[in-house]
């Protein structure tokens, strides 16, 4: 009865898999309240005249008001859910549809939550409906829209920051790989230089040994030559002749002895 063809504007049975728990609860409560108001409207009167009066006078007006109330309230709830900073509402993602969202205890949103709770708890009392003025709803929506734009821009900046961070991470990986390759090249060059230095040290040590052996051999050779020269000069040494007895006797007195004997002695020399 409530869901007949005349209520084409009813969005019931909506897909709430991607909504936050808060929005899902709010919309469910809204559906129940709307059904209750329509039930009151569709109640049969005691007499035919009363039913006719209700049908022709009140019913169209009440249905229009319920329609307006339902659309405004639903739109406001969806917009408010988008503005909540800790909302996990994410369209097109089924993997995050069951994440927890924060309640209305944040200081920056407590006043708005309280206003919404008071507004959502409004109900029909003693057969009289409590309606929200359309101008009031429009004012609230106008206040919300700039915040929504700022929030959307913030989300765009956040996405840009995420993209930039991802790009920087990729560049960091590339640079790290380049540094690693350079370090490997340096280590290989150091290993090659170490091998070359070791070979030079060994060659230097071998050359030192050869030079030392050559010097020792040359010194030994020079020592042997000097000894041979000394041995070669020994046969040529002259014997000293003492002529003291021969000349002192004749020249000391300025007179020569017997000529014949003297000449014989000289001949002997």
Curated annotation (Swiss-Prot):
Disordered: annotated span: 87-113
Protein name, UniProt field: Protein NETWORKED 3A
Any one annotated GO CC term: nuclear membrane
Domain NAB: 6-87
Superkingdom of origin: Eukaryota
Biological role: Plant-specific actin binding protein. May be part of a membrane-cytoskeletal adapter complex.
Compartment(s) of residence: Cytoplasm, Cytoskeleton; Nucleus membrane
Biased composition (Basic and acidic residues): 91-103
Keyword tags: Coiled coil, Cytoplasm, Cytoskeleton, Membrane, Nucleus
Protein source organism: Arabidopsis thaliana
Phylogenetic classification of the source organism: Eukaryota, Viridiplantae, Streptophyta, Embryophyta, Tracheophyta
UniProt record similarity statement: Belongs to the NET family.
One matching Pfam family: KIP1
UniProt xrefs under InterPro entries: NAB, NET_actin-binding_domain
Secreted is among the record's keywords: no
Residues forming coiled coils: 155-214
Record flagged with keyword Nucleus: yes
GO molecular function terms attached to this record: actin binding
Domain notes from UniProt: The NAB domain, also called NAB (NET actin-binding) domain, is sufficient for F-actin binding.
